[in-house]
């Protein structure tokens, strides 16, 4: 999450991009123009490498720690135990963000931040996190298990895809849909006829 100061700096950049002098003047800009500008607005890069970096719509408009609505960074809140104890279902695809950006530059090595967050969640107690790792190669163009490819399965929308899914894909989708529905209803994804899904614990990662 951004700091309030960085969010304010980015807001000032956006006003300049809109060619307006104040928030009041910005409010007179037609909504369609605002939406278009929000997408084309160059991404902010405080590292000094230049403003025009990829994924601008994703990186420009993220929450900030403003001291009122959000009072601390999410990771810090987890570690300090400042959260409502609730069950969690979280996961990733094996090909998550493995394709380079539009300029072909490979992504730097990550620091396993999501695993650290899960560890912090488990250590805080009072909840049971269930974790999944989606590893199904998408048929059609050998794209692998790319970002969001699990959504077709969990929401049961395989028929809406152009990809040549087969019978076992639909079986997996049905099982995932049941897991997700059970979790939403009870906080536990397990149910009759489903392979047991064990919650993560402080002693190690389980999928």
Show where each model-derived region lies:
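Substrate-access "cap/lid" subdomains that shape
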Residues: 1-119
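Mobile gating loops/cap/lid regions near enzyme active sites that modulate substrate access
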Residues: 47, 119, 123-207
